[in-house]
Amino acid sequence: MARSIKKGPYIAHHLLKKIDAINESGSKNTIKTWSRSSTITPEFVGHTLAVHNGNKFIPVFVTENMVGHKLGEFSPTRTFKGHTKKNKNKK
């Protein structure tokens, strides 16, 4: 179910403050965040965000195509190690 338009997109306040500070200073630092549910806005474009996946921080470089998506979509939480191979010679 989509979020109401009158409410606007969810963005963590601490993350928005950090992005605004970096945009004003012009530096290109990596920002660590645990806020996987924050929506990517146009202010984020061109920055690298380290998104926590429950184990470690995954660096995500934000491009224009990512605007409107959530940060958690680009930091997978589960690792797929493959299905077990059947042994044909088993008797």
Swiss-Prot record:
Superkingdom of source: Bacteria
Protein name, UniProt field: Small ribosomal subunit protein uS19
GO cellular component: cytoplasm; small ribosomal subunit
Record GO terms (molecular function): rRNA binding; structural constituent of ribosome
Lineage of the species this protein comes from: Bacteria, Pseudomonadati, Bacteroidota, Cytophagia, Cytophagales
Gene3D superfamilies membership: 30s Ribosomal Protein S19, Chain A
Stored SUPFAM superfamilies: Ribosomal protein S19
Protein family (similarity comment): Belongs to the universal ribosomal protein uS19 family.
Pfam family, one: Ribosomal_S19
A GO biological-process term: translation
Keywords assigned by UniProt, alphabetized: Ribonucleoprotein, Ribosomal protein, RNA-binding, rRNA-binding
Xref: PROSITE patterns: RIBOSOMAL_S19
Coiled-coil annotated residue ranges, if any: none
Known function: Protein S19 forms a complex with S13 that binds strongly to the 16S ribosomal RNA.
